[in-house]
A protein has these predicted regions:
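DNA major-groove recognition helix of helix-turn-helix
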Residues: 54, 77-78, 84
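General nucleic-acid-binding
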Residues: 1-22, 97, 101
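Short, Lys/Arg-enriched N-terminal segment that forms or immediately precedes the first helix
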Residues: 25-39
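Short alpha-helical "recognition helix" segments of helix-turn-helix
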Residues: 61-65
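Short Lys/Arg-enriched helix C-cap and helix-to-coil transition segments
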Residues: 83-102
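Short, amphipathic alpha-helical "recognition" segments used to contact nucleic acids or chromatin
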Residues: 42-57
């Protein structure tokens, strides 16, 4: 049972890393900045990353593979669409990511 969970988590980590790489490419922001930096464009990229991941993972799983708290993941997911209303670049980044994710 534990081995199955480890395999499942490894698969989720692969998805996380692929999507993070794509977010980094499209946003032209280094992956490490997306993960930790609090500049507005980095936060936008992080929100887009979480929005895409939340289509395939729950908040706990995203938290486990990213190292972010569940509260951060939940806040980003819940506030994503509101933030898109005021951040044109975030909306465009998300559209590009959705074509990649399908």
């Amino acid at each position: 049972m534990l081995n199955n969970y480890r395999a499942f988590l490894f698969m989720k980590e692969e998805v996380f890393n692929k999507v993070l790489e794509r977010v980094s490419e499209l946003s032209e922001i280094a992956s490490d900045k997306i993960l930790k930096c609090n500049q507005e464009e980095c936060v936008d990229a992080r929100y887009a990353l979480i929005a895409v991941l939340s289509e395939r993972m729950n908040d706990r799983q995203i938290s486990e593979v990213s190292g972010w708290s569940i509260q951060l993941v939940n806040k980003a997911r819940n506030n994503f669409h509101e933030r898109c209303k005021f951040r044109w670049g975030l909306k465009e980044l998300y559209k590009e990511l959705c074509t990649f994710a399908t």
